[in-house]
Amino acid sequence: MRTDTDKLIIAGREFNSRLMVGTGKYADFQQMVKAIEVSGAEIITVAVRRVNISDRNKESLLDHIDTKKYTLLPNTAGCYTADDAIRTCRLAREAGLSDFVKLEVLGDEKTLFPDNEELLKAAKVLIKEGFTVLPYTTDDPIVCKKLEDIGCAAVMPLGAPIGSGLGIRNPYNIRIILDTVKVPVIVDAGVGTASDAAIAMELGCHGVLMNTGIAGAKDPIAMAEAMNLAVRAGRLAYRAGRIPKKLYATASSPVEGTIE
């Protein structure tokens, strides 16, 4: 099965890699750059709050990212209201980062769960202003459908709380979301190891976004490679079509020619 034609398409943009990665929590910029390279990711998300917009003379993580090679996805991490998230996206666009944004509006500091009411409010405004919005949301099919209906280019339900490494806690909801919306479904948050990423892709998700799963590993470079392979393997397995699960065995060897 050819994989070079199996591209991720978001708002008309084509990407070969279905893995998206963040830029935080690395030991240094050099480690970040190497991990991103090894991951094979083409979409890199950056927290607008971490980018030094006001003083370009100071070192910034953007100094270490080749924007001709990667697509930047500014995110609104740390925003707890729609107004704050909207302001942050406007700043990103004015600074020349991108109008292709990952929208986060958090509702709780302990769980970092999204505030879906504020998220929908912010998404409506940003879409009207011409932003391409990829919202981080709960694994609620109803909310995901509402986000699609107002014009979001994809939906990004969490697999588990941000940074928890708990994996895909509710695969059934993810399946329902996949059956409910037509835009790409990107699992965002909770992926802790390669098997988590593979499971997300085997469910039929169009991609996976992660940061802590790679940056927080004992060897981030090795984990970046593992996640790269896992996403590709999971996608290939999904397209290949797994065998159905059955309670009893089915012999894999032919019974013809057996000695009586």
From Swiss-Prot:
EC number: 2.8.1.10
Keywords noted in UniProt: Cytoplasm, Schiff base, Thiamine biosynthesis, Transferase
Active site as annotated: 102 (schiff-base intermediate with dxp)
GO cellular component terms, A-Z: cytoplasm
Residues at which 1-deoxy-D-xylulose 5-phosphate binds: 163, 189-190, 211-212
Any GO molecular function: thiazole synthase activity
Primary location: cytoplasm
Pfam families: ThiG
Gene3D superfamilies per the UniProt record, alphabetical: Aldolase class I
Cellular compartment(s): Cytoplasm
Pathway in which this enzyme or protein is active: Cofactor biosynthesis; thiamine diphosphate biosynthesis
Domain of life: Bacteria
Catalytic activity, reaction form: [ThiS sulfur-carrier protein]-C-terminal-Gly-aminoethanethioate + 2-iminoacetate + 1-deoxy-D-xylulose 5-phosphate = [ThiS sulfur-carrier protein]-C-terminal Gly-Gly + 2-[(2R,5Z)-2-carboxy-4-methylthiazol-5(2H)-ylidene]ethyl phosphate + 2 H2O + H(+)
Subunit structure: Homotetramer. Forms heterodimers with either ThiH or ThiS.
Record's function text: Catalyzes the rearrangement of 1-deoxy-D-xylulose 5-phosphate (DXP) to produce the thiazole phosphate moiety of thiamine. Sulfur is provided by the thiocarboxylate moiety of the carrier protein ThiS. In vitro, sulfur can be provided by H(2)S.
Family: Belongs to the ThiG family.
PANTHER family, per the entry: THIAZOLE SYNTHASE
Protein name: Thiazole synthase
Originating species: Geotalea uraniireducens (strain Rf4) (Geobacter uraniireducens)
Gene: thiG
